[in-house]
């Protein structure tokens, strides 16, 4: 098994991003790749400035497939619908099976959210999160939220004190 991580132009430029955001994301990817490698995983890492960078996720996967004999490609369910729609075509484009696995980094699955949203006239995420917190026990003390407040939106709307500079 190999793990492919790729910094690609398509993902960095599909909408205008602040340069510092792109630097943060690429830095996080590089640190994650190193951690995986240090843990013994076989990592293929494609930097944005690599001479042979293919420019898109699909093209990087195609290139990796041309360099190695993979039986299938396994990806994590992406956080963006446009990426999901692209990945759903990869099996046809690559000629090998593509498995899209659930992303367990979220508090709920897409199915759980769909079930919650069905029949509701208004989707207020705060109420969904309350249900998920009760279900999972996250940030809960018994059946009450930690600190007896469901959210701190009012506190988050306050201006940063003048004597504090952001990092």
Question: What label would you give each PLM region?
Answer:
Residues 1-48:
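N-terminal beta-strand-loop-alpha-helix module at the start
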Residues 12, 52, 107:
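Flexible, glycine-rich phosphate/dinucleotide-binding loops
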Residues 21-24, 28, 53, 79, ...:
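Catalytic cores of large soluble enzymes that bind and process phosphate-bearing ligands
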Residues 48-49, 78:
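Short strand-loop junctions, especially beta-strand C-caps/beta-turns
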Residues 49-55:
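Acidic-and-aromatic substrate-binding clefts and catalytic sites of carbohydrate-active enzymes
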Residues 56-167:
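Beta-rich, aromatic/charged-enriched effector core domains that present basic-aromatic interfaces
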